Amino acid sequence: DSFKSFYQNAWPILKEKKIPFIIFVNTREINNNHPNYMTWNQIRELRDSGLVTIGGHSWSHEYFIDMKFDEVKKDIEKSHQDYLKELKFIPDLYAHTFGETSTDLINLIKKFNYKIIFGQHSGVISQSENIYYLPRFSLNENYGKPKRFKNILRSRAFNLKSYEPKTILLNTSNNPTNLKLAFHENVKGINCF
């Protein structure tokens, strides 16, 4: 989300250790010089470092699930204008705001030529993942402690044969839901989180 705290706390460490990463930039608060967000100059510094991939993350960072599709389209178009003006390119990676989406919303966002789209559900990417709803590990003040980061680095993806439900968005008709997983190999001692 391009928070200033990331720039002040994480960026110096990642730069020193030469660890590549993606930062998803929502543009409205940057344009408004919000004190908790990085500036465009700081984002350009990240871009120019060679370690950072800039990803799209909307203009407003609103809950797209609650918006009409024409509003979502306008929001993403505004962010594209900002990216072109400030960074001279439009990102080809995108992260759903709040990680929330639906199949219809994914289909709309795909029309903006994003190669890969991320949710916010934690997990390791496997070959069976939908490239328009990939898991990612968020790192922030609540979920960025060194012990958790080490666990993330040791995580491995399951090689799933199939899973249910296919529905991404839960509502009153499908919640609670039953989760069914089929693995290619025999798996023991699984933890779900």
In which residue ranges do the predicted regions lie?
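Conserved NTP-handling cores and scaffolds of large molecular machines
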Residues: 93-96, 121, 141
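Terminal accessory/targeting
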Residues: 4-41, 50, 111, 127-128, ...
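Metal-dependent polysaccharide deacetylase catalytic core of the NodB/CE4 family, i.e.
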Residues: 3-104, 115, 128-135
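Glycine-centered structural positions embedded in regular secondary structure
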Residues: 55, 117, 181-183
